[in-house]
């Protein structure tokens, strides 16, 4: 019995020792984990603000300092940033230089042209680095055109002379200001009429099977012609809005048709022509059907190998409901090797009295915050510049742009949208990574990126009519801030 008792006591000592060791290990691990988070105490934050009913427009409004974090209460509003949790790398932000933008730009005098360029692309502007353009015409221009004579399937008459008149000079001046961070891509709205089932560049129709190779060759001609002009083409989308029959240039592809055109024609043709490094973006339509397109193309290895990622627009709400940001998150999680790129968005239905209409800007802010938080790497606005009517547009589809020019007076009109976009594009730099950011209330929205220099940019939007006091909690540090009613902030630290 005595020997048995000794064994029991010895076993208890061993168990106690092991338990103590595990508790000590856990405590050590937790301590190490906490200490690994960067402490922002005493670091200074710079805040830039744009707010309705004020003169604040990307204005440096205040500087604050971090202190030690205190447990937030349920009654307090807070933004939580965890710089240790990183996500997608940021490609950039920009907009489209269309024929319409180029027409309007050409009416401005030298001073106003330079002002516009600096506003968008200059060091003191909002830092655009992405440019989208159309492969021949879209609705935003004076009319429809292609780069060949009608019926020329061999593309012997291919020429970009029309683009050299106004579009290319505008693009080149923008590129000179952007420099090495340039991302330039192009999208077709429609093949030439003779290549289509409806023999019309407008009103939808489909690419005829017998012209698939000729159409793939057309992309090659475009890329080579632009690069001969000194414009490095980063990539292209296969078709603008491939499920929309529009009264302007449009062409329909089902998911299977786009997949097969990519894997059997466009992808192999680009590779054969030494252009395999160009980034091909599929879909280029709304968030509603994006998952079907991604599943169909990315689950096919022979098609997927040619696709850099998937592009999308924001117009799915035309049928009712709210933006489908959850679809983007699904793709981000389902296909982590593919990229999400916002390729177009604008406020439709131009009206002069709404040039300073604040909800237009808030639509941009809401989309950009939620798109980035869903895994999007880059964001491309539609026309960077339009005239006093929201055009020119050859089918009268007049819309808003961040900047409008009065072609009669030469005045440049900066809308709230310009400033809201700038809260992202001016401070977040290509190569930044998104970091974990959440809010404790729906009254404010937020996202954050960490630039390569280590600086974090947190963007906060308030769409209510009330000033909001909130805590910005970053790791183990916090600071007390306020945001004006109907306002956007960029916080740099």
What are these regions (language model features)?
Residues 22-37:
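Short, low-complexity, disordered segments immediately C-terminal to signal peptides
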Residues 97, 135, 240, 313-314, ...:
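Residues that line or immediately flank small-molecule/substrate-binding pockets and catalytic motifs
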Residues 239-245:
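Short, conserved phosphate-binding/catalytic loop or strand-edge motifs used
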């Amino acid at each position: 019995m005595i020997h048995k008792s000794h064994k029991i006591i010895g076993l208890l000592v061993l168990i106690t020792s092991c338990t103590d060791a595990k508790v000590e290990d856990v405590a050590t691990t937790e301590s190490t984990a906490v200490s690994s988070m960067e402490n922002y105490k005493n670091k200074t934050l710079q805040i830039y603000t744009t707010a309705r009913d004020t003169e604040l427009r990307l204005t440096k409004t205040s500087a604050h300092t971090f202190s030690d974090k205190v447990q937030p209460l349920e009654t307090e509003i807070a933004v939580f940033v965890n710089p240790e949790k990183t996500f997608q790398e940021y490609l950039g932000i920009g907009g489209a230089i269309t024929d319409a933008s180029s027409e309007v730009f050409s009416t401005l005098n030298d001073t106003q042209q330079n002002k516009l360029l600096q506003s968008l692309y200059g060091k003191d502007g909002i830092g655009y680095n992405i440019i989208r353009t159309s492969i021949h015409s879209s609705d935003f221009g004076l009319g429809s055109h292609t780069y060949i004579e009608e019926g020329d399937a061999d593309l012997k008459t291919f020429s970009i002379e029309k683009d050299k008149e106004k579009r290319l000079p505008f693009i080149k001046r923008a590129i000179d200001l952007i420099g090495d961070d340039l991302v330039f891509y192009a999208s077709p709205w429609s093949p030439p009429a003779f290549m289509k089932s409806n023999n019309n560049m407008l009103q939808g129709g489909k690419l005829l099977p017998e012209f698939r190779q000729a159409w793939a060759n057309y992309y090659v001609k475009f890329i080579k012609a632009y690069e001969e002009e000194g414009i490095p083409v980063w990539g292209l989308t296969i078709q603008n809005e491939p499920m929309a029959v529009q009264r302007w240039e449009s062409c329909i592809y089902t998911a299977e048709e786009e997949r097969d055109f990519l894997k059997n024609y466009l992808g192999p043709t680009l590779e054969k022509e030494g252009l395999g490094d160009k980034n091909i973006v599929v879909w280029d339509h709304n968030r509603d059907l994006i998952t079907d397109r991604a599943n169909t193309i990315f689950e096919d290895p022979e098609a997927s190998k040619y696709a850099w990622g998937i592009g999308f627009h924001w117009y799915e709400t035309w049928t009712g409901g709210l933006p489908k940001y959850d679809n983007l998150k699904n793709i981000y999680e389902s296909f982590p090797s593919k990229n999400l790129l916002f390729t177009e968005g604008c406020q439709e239905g131009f009206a002069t009295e709404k040039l300073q209409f604040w909800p237009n800007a808030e639509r941009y802010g809401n989309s950009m915050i939620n798109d980035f938080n869903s895994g999007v790497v880059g964001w491309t606005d539609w026309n960077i510049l339009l005239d006093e009517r929201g055009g020119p547009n050859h089918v009268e589809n007049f819309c808003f742009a961040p900047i409008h020019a009065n072609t009669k007076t030469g005045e440049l009109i900066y809308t709230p949208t310009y400033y809201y976009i700038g809260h992202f594009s001016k401070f977040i730099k290509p190569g930044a990574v998104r970091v974990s950011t959440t809010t404790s209330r729906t009254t404010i929205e937020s996202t954050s990126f960490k630039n390569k220099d280590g600086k974090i940019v947190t963007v906060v939007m308030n769409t209510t009519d009330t000033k909001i006091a909130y805590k910005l909690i970053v790791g183990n540090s916090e600071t007390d801030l306020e945001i004006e009613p109907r306002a956007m902030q960029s916080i740099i630290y």
